[in-house]
Amino acid sequence: MAKSTKRRPAPEKPAKARKCVFCAKKNQQIDYKDTTLLRTYISERGKIRARRVTGNCVQHQRDIAIAVKNAREVALLPFTSSAR
């Protein structure tokens, strides 16, 4: 006879409600020249972090992506990381 392979369901964790930083601070603007702000949304490999990681809303995540791409074109941010 085969063993029963029923698994116990994982306990449900309450969903952590994250607020968009830019929605919380109404006066904070996303600018491609602000590299210190944009570097917080870029991984070590040079990729733009996902919205589920950063916790931003859809509109502000799009604005960040556009600002990062503009900063890369103007050579304020690298396209890839320098560490290999």
From Swiss-Prot:
User: Record's Gene Ontology CC terms?
Assistant: cytosolic small ribosomal subunit
**From what superkingdom does this record's organism come?**
Bacteria
Note whether RNA-binding occurs among the keywords.
Answer: yes
Q: Which GO terms describe its molecular function?
A: small ribosomal subunit rRNA binding; structural constituent of ribosome
Q: Which InterPro entries match?
A: Ribosomal_bS18, Ribosomal_bS18_CS, Ribosomal_bS18_sf
Listed A to Z, the keywords are: Ribonucleoprotein, Ribosomal protein, RNA-binding, rRNA-binding
Q: Can you cite a GO biological process for this protein?
A: translation
Q: What functional role does this protein have?
A: Binds as a heterodimer with protein bS6 to the central domain of the 16S rRNA, where it helps stabilize the platform of the 30S subunit.
Record note on quaternary structure: Part of the 30S ribosomal subunit. Forms a tight heterodimer with protein bS6.
Query: Of which family is this protein a member?
Result: Belongs to the bacterial ribosomal protein bS18 family.
Q: What is this protein called?
A: Small ribosomal subunit protein bS18
Q: What is the lineage of its organism?
A: Bacteria, Bacillati, Actinomycetota, Actinomycetes, Mycobacteriales
Annotated gene: rpsR
